[in-house]
């Protein structure tokens, strides 16, 4: 699932919207969820996992998606792993609900590709290393691979070898509306339900509605990949897909390193001056410590705008207070500010002013030429120009053409005549 389709901490209020409650069920040793549209197995024991591994061994392609919790804990964690498999034969076992289920949309093309859906609980006391080993040998179908690959790498130390990203495939076909919901509607005429996006996926038991919502994210991926692959084959662009998917794997394997001296520089901090900046830095670090100790997102402790207001208030002589603070937290909050205010001016952080360096005339000329080539290729190929090369990439190559091989895959380089 793409990052844009997921909720983020930055936009949340102090009291995030709670998921609508439905009839909850416990996670027993065996469970089969039967809805009008789904029959799936929930994997929460080693025995269930063993049966799933047997099924994975018989297929070449596996659809995978994840659900994470970053709204209710300090560090984002993997909470659910959804898996869909093509069914080659009727096999009794986990999630078996009789004859092979062929999907809710009888008469549609994906009826010819029966499948089974499973939900693996990473929070259960089950060793998932055998699952990772099994998946590494398969082609993994994902929708917006970057988020899921990074989460699986952090949570399970899993690294995919081959992927089929349905977002990349759709964009190669010139499809502008490439959200999962849009693609499922386009190819299968099915409206995916909404909801549970802000739910607490780390809470147990999960509701039946939450699990149905989660499995929606893989249920259509295999037939969708079949449709997209067929169209790309007709256009002789399957190699383009392989190149871009391999690059996605490589990029997801690179750990994003953030400058520790940048983390506390939140939006609005540039308006602070002198001692206010020192207090903000101290309060930000205090909030991080409190959030980690409580295993809650930082915005549950204090929101960014409240940090900014508190920094200016302390320096002006006021004593900001918040009703939801315990006496211990209130004392630590004020102590952090007092300690920062005792720092000598030489230890105050300096707010950085960013001034762009205007590129030279030759660099501008090269950038304009690259844009012209890109836009012409985009029109000829019926692709979005930014999918061939975004503006930042154009500017980087105009400055240093040798970085083209790092920033672009071969088909993109060819489109720019590099």
Regions found by a protein language model. Give the residues of each.
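Short aromatic/hydrophobic-glycine micro-motifs
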Residues: 61, 99, 188-190, 237, ...
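Accessory DNA-binding and partner-docking regions appended to nucleic-acid-acting proteins
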Residues: 208, 228-418
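Short N-terminal alpha-helical targeting/association segments
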Residues: 6, 14-16, 57, 157, ...
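Intrinsic disorder/low-complexity segments
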Residues: 2-39, 87-115
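Short hydrophobic/aromatic-rich motifs at helix boundaries and adjacent loops
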Residues: 53, 100, 120-124, 152-156, ...
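Conserved DEDDh/DEDDy metal-dependent 3′-5′ exonuclease domain
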Residues: 40-62, 69-94, 113-231
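Generic structural signal for short, solvent-exposed loop/turn connectors between secondary structure elements
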Residues: 10, 15-19, 34-42, 88-91, ...
């Amino acid at each position: 699932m793409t990052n844009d389709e997921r909720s983020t901490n930055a936009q949340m209020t102090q009291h995030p919207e709670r998921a609508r409650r439905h009839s909850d069920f416990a996670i027993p040793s065996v469970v089969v969820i039967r809805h009008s549209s789904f029959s799936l197995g929930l994997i929460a024991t080693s025995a269930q996992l063993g049966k799933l591994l047997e099924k994975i061994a018989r297929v070449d392609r596996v659809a995978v998606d994840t659900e994470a919790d970053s709204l209710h804990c300090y560090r984002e964690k993997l909470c659910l792993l959804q898996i869909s498999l093509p069914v080659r034969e009727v096999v009794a076992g986990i999630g078996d609900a009789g004859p092979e289920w062929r999907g809710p949309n009888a008469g549609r093309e994906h009826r010819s590709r029966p499948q089974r859906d499973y939900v693996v609980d990473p929070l259960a006391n089950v060793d998932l290393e055998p699952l990772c080993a099994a998946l590494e040998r398969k082609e993994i179908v994902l929708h917006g691979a970057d988020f899921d690959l990074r989460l699986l790498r952090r949570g399970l130390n899993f690294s995919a070898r081959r992927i089929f990203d349905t977002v990349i495939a759709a964009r190669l076909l010139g499809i502008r509306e490439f959200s999962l919901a849009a693609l499922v509607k386009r190819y299968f005429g099915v409206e995916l339900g909404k909801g549970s996006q802000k739910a607490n996926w780390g809470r147990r038991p999960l509701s039946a509605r939450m699990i149905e919502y989660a499995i929606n994210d893989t249920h259509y991926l295999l037939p969708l990949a079949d449709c997209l692959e067929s169209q790309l084959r007709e256009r002789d662009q399957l190699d383009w897909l392989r190149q871009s998917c391999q690059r996605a794997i490589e990029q997801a394997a690179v750990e994003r390193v953030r400058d520790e001296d940048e983390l506390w520089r939140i939006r609005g901090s540039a308006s602070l001056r002198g001692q206010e900046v020192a207090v903000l830095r101290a309060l930000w670090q205090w909030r991080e410590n409190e959030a980690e100790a409580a295993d809650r997102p930082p915005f549950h402790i204090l929101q960014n705008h409240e940090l900014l207001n508190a920094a200016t208030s302390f320096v002006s002589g006021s004593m900001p207070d918040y009703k939801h603070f315990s006496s211990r937290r209130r004392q630590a909050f004020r102590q952090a500010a007092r300690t920062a205010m005792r720092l000598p001016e030489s230890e105050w952080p300096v707010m950085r002013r960013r001034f762009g360096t205007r590129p030279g005339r030759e660099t501008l000329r090269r950038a304009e030429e690259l844009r012209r080539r890109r836009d012409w290729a985009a029109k000829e190929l019926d692709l979005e120009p930014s999918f061939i090369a975004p503006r930042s990439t154009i500017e980087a190559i105009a400055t240093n053409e040798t970085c083209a091989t790092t920033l672009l895959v071969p088909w993109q380089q060819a489109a720019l005549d590099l």
